[in-house]
Amino acid sequence: MMERDGGTHYIVNEKALPIVLLKTVEAKELLKKGEVVTIHEAVDRVGMSRSAYYKYKDYIFPLYEMNKGKIITMHLILKHLPGILSEVLNQIAESEASVLTINQSIPAHGIANISVALETRQMTINIEELILKMEQIKGVQKINILAQE
């Protein structure tokens, strides 16, 4: 069995996380937004122990915090419609992410596969918000994060 050094990161849907990890994120958000002043207030409000908070606080972050200043590679599946890629790129530009590379397959059966590498350092919104905005574009079928550096 291979030993883990603790440096591996995973993207996990919140539905699969234990409640203590979700409460840790919630407590951190309360502190960050200034809704509470102390850790004691934050953990009381979310209903967790201070020891659990301290145990996990340095190991759980929303995706947008982990991705700030990183290179993100996304895979998009788009319907083959005029202007759809342009709309996606406009959303990226509005977020002030920097497109490092973009690759598009030749559309087959009305579908185009796109991979885009973005540098997120200057983004004005988090990556989750950008994905939500891109998913609202007519013809965007699916968006996946493939990698982050």
Swiss-Prot record:
Q: Which HAMAP family match?
A: UPF0735
User: What region holds the ACT domain?
Assistant: 73-148
UniProt superkingdom: Bacteria
What is the designated name of this protein?
Answer: UPF0735 ACT domain-containing protein Amet_0565
- Report the family membership: Belongs to the UPF0735 family.
